[in-house]
């Protein structure tokens, strides 16, 4: 099963300070490009949205510069960019903090409002995925995510709701443990959802393990986890395996504060 859980992942081009405009009159010198690792859904979405790929032998090839410094999760990306005034990288809008600054895209600031009205056009999906077999406990947690309770948390964390008319969550009688694995971009909002859910339904525990989108999708397909987290669209070969996707969010491009 595939579902969009949030709204749109805005590509926030980041440097170092709060979300807003990057003043390009800044320090002189070469720009240090900070990228994510292979397998990252954020990286996959970024190169697609910004056209940083070429087609070779019928396959799309990631053309990220070989000079880029590679980070393996969202927190490391933010810390790396914050510590280098000549750097530029990318994270989800909901992951931005006051150590970095989001670059305007075509004059539009990276805000949830601008994403919702399509002024800020750099967007990608946040999905949760499952295999063919889903436990009652996992289904109940997904019901919570897609309820008005879950959607309100998603909005509070800076993402866009998928369903403005979602109904209030009603706990079922399921018991057990739910393991969620995957994208470090989806991880923070998933942890908030899990925390709130476990206060509402004390019969179920939720464990969130952060890695990358590809690992999350494969783990859900292979039954290693109940729910996979992905910060990109699913590939044809993934959907053919029966993986289903739940959300939508935004991507931001951060740089350093001056």
Task: List each model region and its residues.
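Exported/periplasmic ABC-transporter solute-binding proteins
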Residues: 4, 24-251, 257
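Sec-dependent N-terminal signal peptides of Gram-positive bacterial secreted proteins and lipoproteins
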Residues: 4-24
